[in-house]
């Protein structure tokens, strides 16, 4: 599962470049369009619903209902912010609900977020840290952030 973030779009481009045989479930119109022309090995499930033009993503009841019919080994998502007290947070209620459903319908949960997302503000709780398995980020986190994530048994993976 790949969410509608630009980070997951970058992951999708890597999947094409590596020519991986994989199944992908997404609510991202950009990712659907990318695989439409970029890979024949990918089994792609594009979730419909109400199109949110700004993020080129499908949101709403229909999207959540369709997503709830699938089960995935892994979900990859980003979010507008990570709150040290509350976990993953979003600025949009509908997108937050989609991300919660990604977590519910997958076995292992990856949050891919650059260093600017840590301690940002947002007003919709997606989920607490107890539901996250791996955080992938680009720069070393503060000791406080490392302690919080490690206290929830979250693996921290640093990448460039």
Residue positions per predicted region:
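Short active-site oxyanion
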Residues: 19-24, 131-134
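Short beta-strand scaffold positions
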Residues: 2-3, 26, 137
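Conserved N-terminal glycine/acidic-rich loop preference
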Residues: 7, 24-25, 42
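Active-site catalytic pocket residues across diverse enzymes, especially alpha/beta-hydrolases
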Residues: 14-19, 35-39
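Helix-turn-helix/homeodomain-like alpha-helical modules used for DNA recognition
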Residues: 1-17
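Conserved phosphate- and dinucleotide-binding cores of soluble alpha/beta proteins
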Residues: 32-160
